[in-house]
């Protein structure tokens, strides 16, 4: 038998042993080759002398498939505003491509699609001071907006743990009555007990603005049994989570037409839905705030883990099949006459 075919038989025996656990005796019997002949081939290794050495690329079982790489590039071009980590988790959630963030980064870098990173200062606070569950602490603040020819005030109540905007309104003024009515509407979103009071009583955190120290605002909190914590004067970083959400919303408002109050309310309602339900938040492990607020965070993480594991398994099978052949045997007619 020519050395080339001897080599193919040897590769088939090794592959059958590695992939199926078959001993050489069983594989050789299936191929119709006497064991004595096979071991003589091994001793002589004629194929090693007859064939030039070939540089063989090591098999990378979990390398991203060509179709996965293309899917990443297509998705990245459709969403140039997303960075690689958020891009990776969005594609997992939407079943576009189940790849790790580091793999997505390498694919984008090879295609020169990685945006330069702008370092932003992080507003930090002690771990012991942070909320550890939904409805433990709400943060509130006002953001001034220009609508048409007038000035309005966007007030937001955000769950600190989940980064979920519980309630928002566009106010005509920043007086105590307006903010107290907004606070009442936010508190009404909480589930109630038999006594009519909220079953959960989040602490309300605000700055020391006149609207948040007004008698009307404090009275609403007291009526519902909610505590009030005011941050230190001139320390807006203590309200960092809501300040960051305002920056995100301002960026999203660029290019939007806020010609009148009704149009502005529609735009803000749409952006708040996007922020709560679609935007993946890095501090939440790239989960949408609503998923965490509703207590479905671990369920979503488990879905992601399962998708990644399944994709990894499929990738391994396909890569091994492409580089090693789908069957461990050579054609029977090529070895009929050893």
Regions found by a protein language model. Give the residues of each.
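Short hydrophobic alpha-helix segments
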Residues: 168-169
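Residue-level signal for the short linker/turn that defines the boundary of a DNA-recognition helix
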Residues: 21-23, 82, 99, 259
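C-terminal domain-tail junction helix/linker
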Residues: 58, 222-224, 248-338
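Residue-centric detector for conserved, function-critical "anchor" positions
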Residues: 1-33, 42-57, 63, 71, ...
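Mobile-element integrase/transposase regions
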Residues: 97-98, 102-158, 164, 177-201, ...
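RNase H-like polynucleotidyl transferase catalytic core
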Residues: 200-208, 222-241, 257-261
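Acidic/histidine-rich, metal-coordinating catalytic segments
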Residues: 193-213, 239, 287-290
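Basic, flexible linker segments flanking DNA-binding modules
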Residues: 39-137, 235-236, 293-297, 302, ...
């Amino acid at each position: 038998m020519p050395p080339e075919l001897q080599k193919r038989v040897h590769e088939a025996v090794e592959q059958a042993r590695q992939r199926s656990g078959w001993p050489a005796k069983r594989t050789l019997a299936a191929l119709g080759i006497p064991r004595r002949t096979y071991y003589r081939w091994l001793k002589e290794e004629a194929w090693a002398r007859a064939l030039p050495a070939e540089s063989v690329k090591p098999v990378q079982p979990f390398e991203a498939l060509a179709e996965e790489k293309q899917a990443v590039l297509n998705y990245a071009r459709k969403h140039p505003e997303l960075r690689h980590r958020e891009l990776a988790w969005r594609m997992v959630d939407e079943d576009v491509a189940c790849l790790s963030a580091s793999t997505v980064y390498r694919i984008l870098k090879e295609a020169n699609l990685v945006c330069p990173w702008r370092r932003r200062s992080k507003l930090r606070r002690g771990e012991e001071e942070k909320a550890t569950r939904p409805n433990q602490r709400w943060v509130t603040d006002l953001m001034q907006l220009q609508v048409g020819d007038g000035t309005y005030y966007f007030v937001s109540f955000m769950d600190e743990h989940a980064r979920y905007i519980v309630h928002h309104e566009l106010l005509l003024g920043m007086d105590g009555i307006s903010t107290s009515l907004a606070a009442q509407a936010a508190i009404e979103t909480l589930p109630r007990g038999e006594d009519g009071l909220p079953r959960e009583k989040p602490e309300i955190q605000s700055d020391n603005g006149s609207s948040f120290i007004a008698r009307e605002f404090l009275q609403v909190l007291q009526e519902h049994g909610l505590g009030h914590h005011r941050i230190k004067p001139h320390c807006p970083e203590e309200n960092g989570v809501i300040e960051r959400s305002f920056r995100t919303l301002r960026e999203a408002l660029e290019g939007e037409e806020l010609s009148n109050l009704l149009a502005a309310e529609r735009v803000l309602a749409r952006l708040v839905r996007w922020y709560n339900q679609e935007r993946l938040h890095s501090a939440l492990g790239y989960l949408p705030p609503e998923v965490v607020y509703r207590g479905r965070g671990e369920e979503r993480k488990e879905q992601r883990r399962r998708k990644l594991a399944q994709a990894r398994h499929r990738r391994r099978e396909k890569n091994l099949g492409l580089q090693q052949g789908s069957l461990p045997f050579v054609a029977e007619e090529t070895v009929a006459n050893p």
